Amino acid sequence: MGTNPVHGLPFLPGSSFTDSTKTAFHRSQTLNYRNGYAVVRRPTMGIGGDRLHYNQLSQAELDELANKAPILTYGPLKQAPLAEFVPAHVAFDKKVLKFSAYFQEDVPISMEEHYRIRHVNIYYYLEDDSMSVIEPVVENSGIPQGKLIKRQRFTKNDMGDHYHWKDLNRGINLTVYGKTFRIVDCDRFTQDFLESQGIELNPSEKIPLDPYTQLRKEPVRKYVTPSDFDQLKQFLTFDKQVLRFYAIWDDTDSLFGECRHYIIHYYLMDDTVEIREVHERNNGRDPFPLLMNRQRMPKVLVENAKNFPKCVLEISDQEVLEWYTAKDFIVGKPLTILGRTFFIYDCDPFTRQFYKDKFGMPDLPPVDVTKKEPPPVKQELPPYNGYGLIEDSAQNCFALIPKAPRKDVVKMLMNDNKVLRYLAALESPIPEDKDRRFVFSYFLATDMISIFEPPVRNSGIIGGKFLGRTKVVKSFSPVDNPIYYSPSDFFIGAVIEVFGHRFVILDTDEYVLKYMESNASQYSPEALASIQNRIQKPELPAPELESKQATGEPMVQGTEESKVQDLDALIDQIHMHLKYNSYKENLRETFQMYDKDESGYVDRETFFKICETLNVPVDDSLIKELIRLCTHGEGRINYYNFVRAFSN
């Protein structure tokens, strides 16, 4: 509530009074809506409800009202009703401005193009001022195309402003996300809309051509000299003349492949080729006659056409350097047509006569292409695992249910209960094994060997069966073709290797001698002499031999029997002389290596070479005498007797 001074009284305390009728002291409202539009009116009432005089009509307005204006006579003009308010998202719904543009893309690594021109369409959506960039899809372009920039509001500058349709026009550059688009044209609706808004459009431009696309559209220049060949003459001369060839297509190298027969027709009138398949009865194939229709066959293609599959390539004259002709079809030579290789093995009589007259080929012999039976497959046995006999193990590879190997029944009946027994010593560097003796039993019926060691009291070695009855393979025999020990390998001084153990035959019984005499053809003369002399020899006293060597008296070569006796006595003397000396154990194997014929002899040069390699004291007097006794004939030395002197 306020106080107002009374007119004519000074504004002093006591001269102002409060108007109790005034109850509203708010400011008058001047903002309002009329027909959907915001309007402003002048305030007419002040605070407290007092009328404002300074917001009334001006003097000019009062003068105008005072005039006799038509409005005083006819009244105020009626204003047209305002249009109904329509929001922008409704007014511009589905209204899009379309601009045609392009941008230039650099191609850094290419010898054929340095840049390419890509066409795009820029769409401006009036309802929310958003934009999008879409590139029309070009078939087989090899470039990811379609929507380049999704619909959004494009940033105009760093201040955060966005592009508006007032900023778009023809002939301007539009930079979005670092990529510059050149707007060259727009559609009819866009042109009408911009002109209706008072925007003057620039003239339209043309999109520049892409250099690589234009290069590909240009035809390949091919400078061909017109041929003087008369095709009409060829047609009239060779009409109804066809060369017939018989060929095969061998596809047996591939999975489920087979060899199929074909007939190749070459038409001389136009140099075309036709391939027909020869069907057999009940071959399981559809009896379609043609494999390849009649057409010209390319022989040499241009470089670019070689990388394309031949089976789907539509051949044209620009892609072919050379075509197949009649001289390319020769009997006995392969021919590749559309990636498939045919072998021509025969032709008809007319074709032979044509090649004889045209190319001077008098003889075109047919080639035999009948399928030959493959050679039988040799069954290969797996490697021997060392268990049991090889013959027994091999039966597992011959049948699902193994059978016992066949036996020589005649041999078993003739040699039943015939056993050859030998006394042998074990060659071993262990001193306790030097005095061990073994009895070898060779069973002639089955060629098996058993070894028995007689027990010796207080020897510390359990005697008895050393090896059960079995076949023994020689150490140097191959695994796939084993060689077993036979009776001819057993004689005095022979070394028998049984599963890594080396035995030296020392003695035998009278039955072995009788068997060797009755089967002398199986043994060498040295083997027969060694066993016979071993049984019948008298001992030569060693002191007498020593006296002969000491005095240097020559030993006269007597009979063969006395020579063997002297040799045995000399070997015993060398054993005592070389008792504390040791030599290599492979002395016998070295001699056998150089004895290719297994005769038991080597020449003198080889003999002394081996002795020098193994450090054998050949300069010793006893060794010299041993070499003399072991010499037979001219320059041949029996190394079996020589090695006996060095065995323990």
UniProtKB/Swiss-Prot annotation:
SMART domains: DM10 (SM00676), EFh (SM00054)
Alphabetical UniProt keywords: Cell projection, Cilium, Cytoplasm, Cytoskeleton, Flagellum, Repeat
InterPro entries according to UniProt: DM10_dom, EF-hand-dom_pair, EF_hand_dom, EFHC1/EFHC2/EFHB
Tissue expression pattern: Expressed in adult brain including hippocampus, cerebellum, cerebral cortex, thalamus, hypothalamus, amygdala and upper brainstem. Expressed in soma and dentrites of pyramidal neurons of the hippocampal CA1 region, pyramidal neurons of the cerebral cortex and Purkinje cells of cerebellum. Highly expressed in testis, trachea, and oviduct, moderately in lung, and slightly in brain. Highly expressed in sperm flagella and tracheal cilia (at protein level).
Molecular functions (GO terms): alpha-tubulin binding; calcium ion binding
Domain EF-hand per the UniProt entry, residue ranges: 582-617
Annotated stretches, region: Required for its localization in the mitotic spindle and interaction with alpha-tubulin: 1-45
GO annotation, biological process: flagellated sperm motility; intracellular calcium ion homeostasis; mitotic cytokinesis; mitotic spindle organization; positive regulation of apoptotic process; regulation of cell division
Record's GO cellular component terms: axonemal A tubule inner sheath; axonemal microtubule; axoneme; centrosome; cilium; mitotic spindle; neuronal cell body; sperm flagellum
Main location: cytoplasm
Assembly information from the UniProt record: Microtubule inner protein component of sperm flagellar doublet microtubules. Interacts with the C-terminus of CACNA1E. Interacts with alpha-tubulin.
Function: Microtubule inner protein (MIP) part of the dynein-decorated doublet microtubules (DMTs) in cilia axoneme, which is required for motile cilia beating. Microtubule-associated protein which regulates cell division and neuronal migration during cortical development. Necessary for radial and tangential cell migration during brain development, possibly acting as a regulator of cell morphology and process formation during migration. May enhance calcium influx through CACNA1E and stimulate programmed cell death. Overexpression of EFHC1 in hippocampal primary culture neurons induced apoptosis.
Designated name of the protein: EF-hand domain-containing protein 1
Originating species: Mus musculus (Mouse)
